[in-house]
Regions:
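ALDH superfamily catalytic-core signature
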Residues: 55, 90-174
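Rossmann-like NAD(P) dinucleotide-binding subdomain of oxidoreductase/dehydrogenase enzymes
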Residues: 1-126
């Protein structure tokens, strides 16, 4: 165990991301402090209640309701041993700068733009289905959603035709 770990978590998976940070942190013998995205504070309060009502040690998990502008002061606090952030590149740069200035252990999981690569020997039906589900997961609000398609020329027309057909079956919006 290294002590108290600050987790700065995004809004797009407000429960899953927090538990993905908190459970391993606590299991390893550390305390967890959450600074959640400001638009999902209700989720953060509910998660803190889950830990409390489940019989975890008192204060093993705490939720900070603070603006993003105050995060650097929390990182600098001597009680914080490490910080982890899942978020945007600009937020990650800010956290890295502050954490680096006081030599805190740091994990940066920052915004991605995952490519989806379709090669000549791909099972196109499977590729189209997995590409669509990957892109539409959580209404597309995911850093791991397939955002760029790289398709070899030999299968491009078939892939595109199948993709258009399958997407036309989806209901978008209200």
């Amino acid at each position: 165990p290294i002590g108290l770990i600050l987790g700065i978590m995004p809004w797009n998976f407000p429960f899953w991301q927090v538990f993905r940070f908190a459970i391993p942190t606590i299991t390893a013998g550390n305390g967890a402090i959450l600074k959640h995205a400001s638009n999902v504070q209700g989720c953060a309060v509910a998660i803190e209640s889950c830990f409390r009502e489940s019989g975890f040690p008192r204060n093993i998990f705490r939720n900070l309701v603070i603006p993003g502008s105050d995060v650097s002061e929390v990182i600098k606090n001597s009680a914080i041993a490490a910080v982890t952030i899942t978020g945007s590149t600009p937020a990650g740069k800010s956290v890295a700068k502050t954490a680096g200035s006081v030599l805190k252990k740091t994990v940066l999981e920052l915004g991605g733009s995952d490519p989806y690569i379709i090669l000549d020997d791909a099972n196109l039906s499977l590729a189209v289905d997995s590409c669509i589900s990957g892109r539409l997961l959580n209404a597309g609000q995911s850093c791991i959603a397939a955002k760029r398609l790289i398709v070899t020329e030999s299968v491009y027309d078939s892939f595109l035709s199948m993709m258009v057909e399958k997407l036309s079956e989806k209901i978008m919006g209200n």
